[in-house]
UniProtKB/Swiss-Prot annotation:
Signal sequence extent: none
Function, in words: Catalyzes the reversible phosphorolytic breakdown of the N-glycosidic bond in the beta-(deoxy)ribonucleoside molecules, with the formation of the corresponding free purine bases and pentose-1-phosphate.
Highest taxon above the source species: Bacteria
HAMAP family for this protein: Pur_nucleosid_phosp (MF_01627)
The entry's keywords: Glycosyltransferase, Transferase
Top EC class for this record: transferase
Entry protein name: Purine nucleoside phosphorylase DeoD-type
E.C. designation(s): 2.4.2.1
Gene that encodes it: deoD
One GO CC term on file: cytosol
Length: 238
């Protein structure tokens, strides 16, 4: 047990899918996993373990923002022996070729947060996903006949940013989606010797102002989840 996770030792699988919303974690567990058990519920940050096609997998919420996800991912890695973390979340698009409900695989993550500079002695840390996990996700998407975008995300500290001109800079530099966690998760994984990947569904478009509903964000986005789950099986067989 930790101050934030009350699961017993051995309760988590070596791979954990992590949405921000704990109710999305519940949805994933109940919809896609078999033999599901709730294993943690501190602060209502729900976590579950079950099996997917016979493979033990866990799913747990990580909350919103880098500080929250950093707590949970660090404790999962150092206290529960988790080896791989796959964030499955939502992002906002700034490029016109990235559409609402498209799936984005974040091979890298830029950020305006200072957390990786703190852990990397005030130098710039290149926050990237694990290559093999990324390739497995791309392979899983192709097997499903899905087109996905692979590239850089931007992990923002502020949801309501006062610097809207930054979106123009992001578009110029080819940022695929804006979210709030990937760079932090990649930093934690690097620091503590784990592997990580972020897969997002575009929930809103910053340019067109299109958006999905809160219910859609909680209860759908199944393509992203299936890509994540199938990528685990592909990784096991690599």
């Amino acid at each position: 047990m930790t101050p934030h996770i009350n699961a017993p030792a051995g309760a988590f699988a070596d791979v954990v899918l992590m949405p921000g919303d704990p109710l999305r974690a519940k949805y994933i567990a109940e919809t896609f996993l078999q033999d599901v058990k709730e294993i943690t519920n501190v602060r209502n940050m729900l976590g579950f373990t079950g099996t997917y096609k016979g493979r033990k997998i866990s799913v747990m919420g990580h909350g919103m923002g880098i500080p929250s996800c950093s707590i949970y991912t660090k404790e999962l890695i150092t206290e529960y022996g988790v080896k791989k973390i796959i964030r499955v979340g939502s992002c906002g698009a700034v490029r016109m070729d990235v559409k609402l409900r498209d799936v984005v695989i974040g091979f890298g993550a830029c950020t305006d947060s200072k957390v990786n500079r703190i852990r990397f002695k005030n130098h710039d840390f290149a926050a990237i996903a694990d290559f093999d996990m990324t390739m497995a996700a791309v392979q899983a998407a192709k097997a499903k006949g899905l087109n996905v975008h692979v590239g850089n995300l931007f992990s923002a500290d502020l949801f309501y940013t006062p610097d809207v001109e930054m979106f123009d800079v992001m578009e110029k530099y080819g940022i695929l989606g804006v979210e709030m966690e990937a760079a932090g998760i990649y930093g934690v994984a690097a620091e503590f010797g784990a592997k990580a990947l972020t897969i997002c569904t575009v929930s809103d478009h910053i340019r067109t102002h299109e958006q999905t509903t809160p219910e859609e964000r909680q209860l759908t986005f199944n393509d992203m989840i299936e890509i994540a789950l199938e990528s685990v099986l592909i990784g096991d067989n690599a």
